[in-house]
């Protein structure tokens, strides 16, 4: 089972918005040095919505190759077309991803039965561990706990990234899910509490900026060292907040650029961080120890 800090990796781009492979390779190595436990390639934070299919798969392959088996790589392969999600998931498996993360179908707003059948179909089509991803604030559809628990019985479905920040929902899932079905936070601010309830880790935006701190926070929480984990989280709360002053990944890409790790590229319709938020993000980074 994949546990701990799973960075939702940004996708580096040159100023002209072409993909920056050198920076991607360096970012992967930096995360390995900093103790990140797994890498999520081409999720929301990785700008999956504005990468074409070839770019999407190239990023996954390059991350897999650079990691070279040292930590797990989870590939973002969700789509609002079931057949497209199957193709992406199979392609990610073919290039060596350890698991896939599949966001609930967005915009077309399927019913709960539609969500179940969508994910069941993909799980039956491709034999790779698959994590459901529930983020209703972005998709316009909320996978109810009952649906997630039905899917937890389906072979190849390994867990869920629950990004609502609702700890009561997380508690219900943790209490009722079968053994081996992972509940993973998709909300940095509440990740410690979810892990302490019995969750397995945090698919983290903030880990792009302070990977060692998020890794340590997750390790402490998994070990049941609640106060120590909470102490780290309290220090990071301004940074968690700053990462969402504008739509993700706008703030986090700007922050990683300030660290000198990537260039300024971000693809329309996303834009660079508005000047009015620069100081807030800088201050949050300083409070986090940077």
From Swiss-Prot:
Disulphide-bonded residues: none
Keywords: Amino-acid biosynthesis, Cytoplasm, Diaminopimelate biosynthesis, Lyase, Lysine biosynthesis, Schiff base
PROSITE patterns, A to Z: DHDPS_1 (PS00665), DHDPS_2 (PS00666)
Subcellular location: Cytoplasm
GO molecular function, one term: 4-hydroxy-tetrahydrodipicolinate synthase activity
Site (Part of a proton relay during catalysis): 44, 107
InterPro entries named among the record's database cross-references: Aldolase_TIM, DapA, DapA-like, Schiff_base-form_aldolases_AS, Schiff_base-form_aldolases_CS
Active-site feature positions: 133 (proton donor/acceptor), 161 (schiff-base intermediate with substrate)
Oligomer status and interactors: Homotetramer; dimer of dimers.
Protein name per its UniProtKB record: 4-hydroxy-tetrahydrodipicolinate synthase
Organism this protein belongs to: Cellvibrio japonicus (strain Ueda107)
């Amino acid at each position: 089972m994949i546990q701990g800090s799973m960075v939702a990796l940004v996708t580096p781009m040159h100023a002209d918005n072409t993909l920056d492979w050198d920076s991607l390779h360096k970012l992967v190595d930096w995360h390995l040095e900093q103790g990140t436990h797994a890498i999520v390639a081409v999720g929301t934070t990785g700008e999956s919505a504005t990468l074409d299919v070839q770019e999407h798969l190239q990023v996954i392959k390059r991350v897999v190759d650079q990691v070279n088996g040292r930590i797990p790589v989870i590939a973002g392969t969700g789509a609002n077309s079931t057949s497209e999600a199957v193709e992406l998931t199979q392609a990610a498996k073919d290039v060596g991803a350890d698991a896939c993360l599949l966001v609930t179908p967005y915009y077309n707003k399927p019913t709960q039965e539609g969500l179940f059948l969508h994910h069941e179909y993909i799980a039956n089509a491709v034999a790779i561990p698959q994590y459901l991803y529930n983020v209703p604030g972005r998709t316009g559809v909320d996978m109810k706990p009952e649906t997630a628990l039905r899917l937890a019985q389906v072979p190849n479905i390994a867990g869920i990234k629950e990004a609502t920040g609702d700890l009561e929902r997380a508690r219900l899932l943790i209490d009722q899910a079968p053994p081996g079905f992972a509940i993973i936070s998709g909300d940095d601010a509440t990740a410690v509490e979810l892990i302490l309830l019995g969750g397995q880790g945090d698919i983290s935006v903030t880990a792009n900026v302070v990977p060692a701190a998020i890794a340590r926070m997750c390790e402490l929480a998994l070990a049941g060292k609640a106060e120590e984990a909470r102490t780290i989280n309290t220090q990071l709360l301004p940074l968690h907040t700053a990462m969402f002053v504008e739509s993700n990944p706008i703030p986090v890409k700007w922050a990683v650029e300030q660290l000198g790790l990537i260039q300024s590229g971000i693809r329309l319709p996303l834009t660079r961080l508005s000047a009015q938020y620069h100081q807030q993000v800088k201050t949050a980074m300083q409070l986090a120890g940077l």
